[in-house]
From Swiss-Prot:
Protein's gene: tmpA
Chain residues carrying a lipid of type S-diacylglycerol cysteine: 22
UniProt GO cellular component terms: plasma membrane
Ranges for region Disordered: 257-344
Location in or out of the cell: Cell membrane
Residue stretches of biased makeup (Basic and acidic residues): 260-277
Name listed for the protein in its UniProt record: Treponemal membrane protein A
Organism listed in the record: Treponema phagedenis
Top-rank taxon: Bacteria
Signal peptide: 1-21
């Protein structure tokens, strides 16, 4: 009896332990699935954010215009990712979403690569870093082959191509910037030599500001910006120098014209004097320059007399003078007495 009880107790114990173990495994599995779902949800949020940014960047680069078919295919891939998420297949949703983001970024890079290569060719910058230019070209040629089969590798290759082309551009503009700075320095020195008038100081300060920004860009290794800044500063200095020179030339011409006019007047006066010279004792004749002293201020400011005497014409004055002389003569004759005894 005791043996049977012992066997029964042990069986019951094993049964309880078995149920407990199964419950623990199921609970652990559920907890693991919950953790995985939480991780997938967090990853999905990051992928969706990256996907939105990648699509915006590709659109701003006009990849949808230059690659309309590829862009439409990526949008379809993006749609499949959303459908998988709705079906709670987060793993698939994340995989499709990540691939779509890769392709958007690759198309955006292809647009940047085309622009950088055109800039290199237009400005003949390849000679400043030939090795990087060669590597950039090689990487660019591999992008399309990887685009369909391996979106991650295609994106990585496009990044490499863009990096090499940027190195070429930096090397080229660094050298060009140094030359442009020298040109700007020479232009600034030429402006300083002509002495800027106070009225033109604002233009000079503006040119100095452009030069200062170019220096800041150069110190930050932004050589393309520094090259453009130094070039603009040199142009501003040269323009201001030309304005000053033009104004001075205009003033010199005016002075020369006045001098020529004065010389012509003197010549005409000399010719007139030769044809009809004034006698040296003539009224107003003088070989010395006439100095006219200004009237006193109180005289200049004195009010005019409204009842001032009218000027008598010269002819009338002469007639009056003659009559006065004749009248005086008659008076003298009438008062003269005969001398007694006559002339001895």
């Amino acid at each position: 009896m005791k043996l049977k009880s012992l066997v029964f107790s042990l069986s019951a114990l094993f049964l309880v332990l078995g149920f407990t173990g199964c419950k623990s495994k199921a609970q652990a599995k559920a907890e693991q699935e919950a953790q995985e779902r939480k991780a997938f949800m967090a990853e999905n949020a990051k992928i969706e954010k990256r996907l939105m940014q990648a699509k915006n960047a590709a659109t701003e680069a006009e990849a949808n215009v230059y690659y309309p078919e590829k862009f439409a295919q990526i949008e379809d891939l993006e749609k499949q990712s959303s459908e998988a998420k709705e079906q709670d297949d987060l793993k698939k949703a994340n995989s499709l979403g990540s691939a779509a983001a890769d392709k958007y970024e690759t198309l955006a890079n292809k647009m940047k690569i085309a622009n950088q290569r055109s800039k290199i060719e237009a400005n003949k910058l390849a000679k400043y870093d030939e090795e990087s230019y060669r590597l950039g070209e090689e990487a660019e040629k591999k992008i399309d082959g990887l685009y369909k089969s391996d979106s991650v590798a295609a994106l990585q290759t496009s990044n490499e191509s863009l990096m090499y082309y940027n190195k070429v551009i930096d090397a080229g503009y660094k050298s060009l910037s140094q030359d442009a700075k020298k040109t700007a320095d020479d232009a600034k020195a030429a402006l300083t030599a002509v002495k800027v008038a106070a009225s033109l100081k604002p233009q000079q300060e503006e040119a100095d500001g452009i030069y200062a920004k170019a220096e800041e860009a150069e110190n930050s290794a932004q050589y393309e910006q520094s090259y453009g800044g130094y070039t603009s500063a040199a142009q501003a200095y040269n323009d201001l120098t030309q304005i000053i020179k033009a104004k001075r030339l205009e003033a010199q011409k005016a002075m020369q014209a006045a001098k020529t006019k004065q010389e012509l007047s003197a010549k005409l006066a000399n010719e007139a004097d030769k044809e009809s010279p004034l006698p040296e004792n003539a009224e107003g004749f003088s070989k010395e320059p006439i100095e006219v002293e200004p009237l006193p201020t109180d005289v200049l400011n004195a009010p005019q007399d409204e009842k001032a005497e009218e000027t008598v014409p010269v002819e009338e004055m002469n007639e009056n003078s003659s009559e006065e002389v004749n009248g005086n003569a008659e008076k003298i004759e009438s008062t003269e007495e005969p001398i007694e005894g006559g002339v001895q």
